[in-house]
């Protein structure tokens, strides 16, 4: 192992890798690729997560990237909706599919889904979507018309899309452009000519692990497991995938904790100086979703409930020095910052400058209002 590192170094390095310090100049797909996907069940938050990392951006640029096939939208990590790049997205989907969560007895008991039903559902969905863009109701109607699948109508109508997620992970469907307020589905090759397909898991693992550690390292296997699937993939399987990287991953000591990083990043991390940069990040931002809100170096344990709310809601956050020091909300023309009182005096000048940057991104006048929480 190399010399010990500090958590302020690690957090500053992550800020740099995640295009937050300094702000980057990459394309929209390159931001998504660097972050290993962007959580997207709240479309405005997803676009803002990308725009705050780009020195120059435009409203609607995510929608344009989707329309042009430079991004796809589908259920991915932790079963949640994400923006992915079509060239690489199939790699993470492959690992999720490898978990075979839908084959668990609990799925059969709850949904009445046997292996025979799954074997019939996949081709039914692919056939229904071949050359077509269908709303959920149109897709369900096509599926339940098939022999032996009529009982799935209610489950397929679930707002969470539980039965459709395994199909997304196997590359059978992804989201298409909305039709009014209704979602649509299509085949990934139709969504993007850049679609790279769902790789074999062993090949996919090397791609995804390298990408994850390039943005969220140093980290552990458990960090990766939680980010990918909330623990639904076995540690044994993950260890096999990790071992395939050989000496590409190396162990480092961060204030007494043993974690891993890509070998090519070790010297850069060791040379990184702590940062004092202040950033406002939107809800569900990858800065906290990547390591998880239970990473006490990013979100102090006593403040986890301020960030991670009921029903899976993740608050907009104020990051200073690489850790979460507050939350914020937009109230009319006011950006109301709730600065954690234990973090010391609020950096008012830095907060004002960051709100001015937000005002430029959103093309509106904003002012900062700082309070203690």
Cite the ranges covered by each PLM segment.
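Long, low-complexity intrinsically disordered regions
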Residues: 1-288, 293-373
């Amino acid at each position: 192992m190399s010399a010990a590192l500090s958590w302020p170094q690690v957090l500053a390095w992550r800020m740099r890798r995640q295009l937050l310090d300094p702000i980057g100049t990459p394309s929209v797909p390159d931001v998504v690729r660097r972050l290993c996907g962007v959580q997207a069940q709240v479309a405005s938050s997803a676009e803002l997560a990308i725009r705050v990392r780009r020195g120059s951006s435009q409203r609607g640029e995510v929608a344009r990237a989707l329309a042009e096939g430079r991004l796809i939208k589908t259920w991915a990590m932790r079963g949640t909706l994400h923006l992915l790049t079509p060239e690489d997205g199939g790699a993470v989907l492959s690992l999720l599919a490898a978990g075979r969560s839908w084959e668990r007895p609990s799925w059969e008991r709850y949904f009445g889904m046997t292996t025979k039903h799954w074997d019939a559902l996949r081709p039914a969905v692919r056939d229904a979507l071949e050359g077509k863009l269908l709303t959920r109701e149109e897709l369900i109607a096509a599926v339940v018309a098939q022999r032996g699948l009529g009982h799935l109508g209610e489950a397929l109508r679930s707002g969470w899309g539980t039965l459709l997620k395994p199909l997304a992970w196997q590359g059978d469907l992804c989201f298409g452009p909305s039709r009014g307020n209704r979602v649509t589905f299509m085949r990934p090759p139709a969504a993007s000519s850049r679609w790279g397909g769902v790789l074999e898991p062993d090949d996919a693992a090397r791609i995804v692990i390298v990408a994850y550690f390039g943005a969220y390292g140093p980290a552990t296997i458990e960090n990766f497991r939680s980010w990918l699937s909330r623990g639904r993939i076995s540690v044994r399987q993950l260890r096999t995938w990790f071992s395939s990287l050989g000496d590409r991953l190396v162990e480092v000591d961060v204030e007494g904790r043993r974690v891993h990083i890509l070998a090519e990043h070790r010297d850069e991390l060791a040379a990184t100086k702590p940062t004092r940069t202040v950033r406002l990040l939107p809800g569900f931002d990858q800065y906290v979703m990547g390591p998880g809100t239970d990473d006490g170096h990013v979100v102090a344990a006593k403040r986890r409930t301020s960030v991670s709310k009921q029903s899976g809601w993740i608050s907009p956050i104020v990051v200073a020095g690489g850790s979460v020091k507050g939350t914020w909300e937009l109230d009319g023309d006011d950006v109301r910052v709730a600065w954690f009182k234990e973090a010391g005096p609020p950096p008012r000048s830095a907060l004002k400058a960051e709100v001015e940057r937000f005002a430029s991104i959103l093309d509106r006048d904003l002012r900062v209002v700082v309070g203690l929480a």
